[in-house]
Amino acid sequence: MPLEMDQKVNKLTFGCQRSSTSDDDSGCAMEEYTWVPPGLRLEQVQLYFACLPEEKIPYVNSVGEKYRIKQLLYQLPPHDNEVRYCQSLSEEEKKELQMFSAQRKKEALGRGNIKMLSRAVMHATCEKCGEKINGGEVAIFVSRAGPGVCWHPSCFVCSTCNELLVDLIYFYQDGKIHCGRHHAELLKPRCSACDEIIFADECTEAEGRHWHMNHFCCYECETVLGGQRYIMKDGRPFCCGCFESHYAEYCESCGEHIGVDHAQMTYDGQHWHATETCFSCAQCKVSLLGCPFLPKKGRIYCCKACSLGEDVHASDSSDSAFQSARSRESRRSVRMGKSSRSADQCRQSLLLSPAVNYKFPGMFGNADDTLSRKMDDLSMSRQGAGFDNDTWKARDEQETAEDHEEWAEHDDYMTQLLLKFGEKGLFQQPPEDNRSNDHWMSENIKGKNDLQRNNRNQSLASKKYQSDMYWAQSQDGLGDSAYGSHPGPASSRKLQELDMDHGASGYMHEKMPWYKRSLECLSNNLKPQNENICDSMDSLALSNITGASVDAESKSRPSLFSYQNFQELNTRDFDKMSNMGTLNSSMLNRSTESLKSLNSEICQEKPPPEEKPMHTSALKRSKSQTRPQVKFSDDVIDNGDYSSIEIRRPPMSERSRRRVYNSEEQSQRPHHHHHHRRRKSRKSRSENALHLATDSKSSGKERKRSYTAEDYERLFHNKSAHEVQAYIQNADLFGQYSNAASNVGLPSQVVDKFLGLYGEDEDSWCSTCSSSSSDSEEEGYFLGQPIPKPRPQRYQYFSDDLCSPTNALSSSQFSQRTSKSKKKKGHKGKNCIIS
C-alpha cells in the first residue's frame, strides 16, 4: 500500500476516534468544542454547528462558550431540581420540590436527537418554521413528540423565550417544547425576588408577576411592600421614598421634585408638574393643560406670537379700560348692522380736528354759511326760568385753580375727556375774548350750558348729560349697557350734587329790550349750533351709561340743525346713528309712560299729587325711570328706595305698538295736571331729529299762549340785568326768530300739518314741571302776524323762551319732510325701531 494511502487511513481513523462519544455526560469528545452533541461522528457534528449562528457555537474560550454557560443557568436553574440550592424552604416545601422535579423529568424532560435525513425522505417539514427539510440535511427529532416531528437545528428553541435549547435539553408540554425554566412556570409560579418556585399556598401577585409574601419588598431598602404603595422601575418594586430619591424628575418650570403624588407632564425628556401654574406658556403664563402647545428651545408656548417674545396682552388703544366692553359691543354691532368704523378711528379723527363737529362728523361749522346759521338759531329757543348762577359760580371758583392742561398728563382717554369737558369745561364761563383759543370745546357746548342753566328743575339725566355728553359719544356711539357700570368721576359728582340745586330760584332778565341787541353776539353764538340735532342719539347712549333716562322731562334738548346739512343727515348719518343708538337703546330702556301703559295691569304705580312744586328733587322724578337690569358701581349708585316700584320689561311683540297704545289710553282718560305726565318715548326722540322738530319746552302753567312784542318788553322789564346774562351768549334769539319767520315765511297750515304727526293727545311736553296745562288757548299775534290755532289731538312745539309755535322752516324743505313723515306715520320708517 502506498505511503500516501496509509496516511489518509490513519487520518481518518484518528478523526473517528476524536468523534467518538464517551460514557460521561460532558459531551465534549472533540477538543476544539466545549460541548458536542452525543453519538455523532465528526462530519455530523460539523454539519450541526454549521447550522447555528457563529456566536452561539461553543468553541473553547469563545463567546459561544460563555453563552452556553449562561443558558444552562437560565434554562435549567439548579434550584428547580435540587433542594440544596434553595434558600428558605420549609420541610414541606422541600418535599414538594423533590416531587415536582421528579415528575417533570418523568413526564416532560428529554434531549433532542440529531439525524441526517435520507435522500429518499422527500416530505419532512420543520415544526417551528414550517419549511421543508431536504434529504441529506441535519434535523432534530424529539421522541416525546413522535417519530415524524422534526426541527431545523436553528429552530429548536423554547416556545416561550425563543432561545436555543441548551445542550438540546427540552421539556415537552402540550405539543410544544420548552426550556426547564418556562416549563416549571407553566406548572408553578416563580418568585420574582428569589427566582425560586413558590410552593406556598399564598403569594403576592403584582404587575403580572409573583412574589413570596415576604419577598415583595423595596429593591433598595428591602421594606416589605405587602399592602403598601409601591412604584415599579425596571421590573423592580420601590417604595415611594426610595423612588423619589433615586428616580424622581425635576419640574422644568419650578425646579422642584415631581413627587409620586403629583401628576406630571412629559415631553421630549422634559417634565412638568401637571398644574396650571407649571405647565403653562413661558411668555404669557396661560395654562396649557389639555391644549396644544408650541415647543421651542426647551420651553413651551401657547402660540407663535408668544414664542417670538411678543406680548399678546399689550394694547395700542388709548382707552384700554374699555377693551373688553368694546369687544362685546363689537359682537353686538355685527348683529345690529352698526358701522364697522373702529372707536379709535372715530375718536382720533374727531378730537384732532377742531373744525369737525364732534357729535356729527359730517356737519361743519362754516362761518360763511349764513343761511344755515340763521336756520339753526331759529330752531334754538330759550326759556325764561332756570337756576340761579350762585350754585355754579361757587363750584367754578373751586375748580378754576385746576391746571388747564391737567388732562394731557393722563394716559387714559376717558380721564382726559372728563378733565377737559367735565364741569370745568362745561359750566365755567370764560371771557368773550378767550373763546377763540378754546379749540377743544365748541361754542355750541357753551350755548348748551347756558340753556341747561336756565332750567328751573335740573334732573338726574340733565345734570349727567352736561358733564358726560362727550363721554357718551366717545364710545363710538355705543348705546348699549356694555358701559353701564362705568364709575366715571363726572357721573359720581353729578349724582352727589342732585339735591343741591332743586331749590334754586329763576333767572331775572335785563331790562334791555331784545331787539336792541347788536348782531355781534349773533355771530359769536351761531358758530357750530348744528351739533345738537344728534342729541337724541347721544341721550340714548348716555342713558345706558349713566342709568338715568335722558328724556324731554329731564332737560332741555333743543334740536339745532342747518338747512343745508339736513338732507345729508337724512340720507346718511341717521342711517348709522339710529341703528347704533336708537334701536339698541330703545329696546333696553323704556320711557315711564310706555312702561305704565304696557304694564297697567301688572305694575300699579302710585299716582303723584295733582300739583308738584317747581323744585321737586330730580331723584324723586327719576324713580319711575329706574331700570333694574342696569347695574352701577358703588360710586355712582343712588341709595334711594326704589323697592316699591315694580317694572317689568314688556315682550317684544308689544314694544313697537306702544305709541298707538298710549294714544288710545290718553284719549280715554281725562287730562290731569300730573307732574308724572306722558314722556316722549325714545322712538319719538329719534324721529324728532329726523323730522327737524325741536323739543320746545313751555313753562309750567302756560300752554299755547300767544305773545306780542309788548309782552316781551314787560317780561324783560321785570328781570334784573344780572339774570338776563344767559341770553347774551345766544345773541338775540327773539330777533332771529322774528327775522327768520318773516324772511322764510312758511305757511302756517304746513306747520300744523307737520307738527300734527307727533300728537296723540292734547298734552304738551314740558321741560320743568312736566305738567300739561289747560289755560287759555286764545288766538294771538306775534309781531303783527296771526298765529294759527293747532289742530286738536296734536302736539304743538314751542320755543323755550317765546312759548309760541316755531314756524321757522322753509316751505320747500318742510313740505318735503311732511310728505316723508306721512309715509312714516305709525313709525315704520327706516330710522324707526323695528321689533
From Swiss-Prot:
A lipid is attached at residue 832 (S-farnesyl cysteine). It is a peripheral membrane protein. Gene3D superfamilies: Cysteine Rich Protein (2.10.110.10). The modification Cysteine methyl ester is found at residue 832. Residues 312-346, 426-455, 603-706, 769-835 are annotated as: Disordered. Keywords: Cell membrane, Developmental protein, Gastrulation, LIM domain, Lipoprotein, Membrane, Metal-binding, Methylation, Prenylation, Repeat, Zinc. It is found in: Cell membrane. Expressed in the dorsal marginal zone of early gastrulae (stage 10). As gastrulation proceeds, expression expands to include the lateral and ventral marginal zones, excluding the few rows of cells above the blastopore lip. Expression moves dorsally with gastrulation cell movements, and by the end of gastrulation expression is seen in dorsal mesoderm and posterior but not anterior neural ectoderm. Expression becomes down-regulated in mesoderm but remains strong in posterior ectoderm through the neurula stages. It holds the Pfam family PET. InterPro entries: LIM2_prickle (IPR033726), LIM3_prickle (IPR033727), PET_domain (IPR010442), PET_prickle (IPR033723), Pk/Esn/Tes (IPR047120), Znf_LIM (IPR001781). GO terms for molecular function: zinc ion binding. Transmembrane segments: none annotated. SMART domains: LIM. Interacts with dvl2/dsh and mapk8/jnk1. Acts in a planar cell polarity (PCP) complex; polarization along the apical/basal axis of epithelial cells. Regulates the polarized assembly of fibronectrin on the surface of the mesoderm during gastrulation. Essential for gastrulation cell movements, cooperating with dvl2/dsh to activate jnk. Acts together with tes to control axial elongation. This is Prickle-like protein 1-A. It comes from Xenopus laevis (African clawed frog). The lineage of its organism: Eukaryota, Metazoa, Chordata, Craniata, Vertebrata.
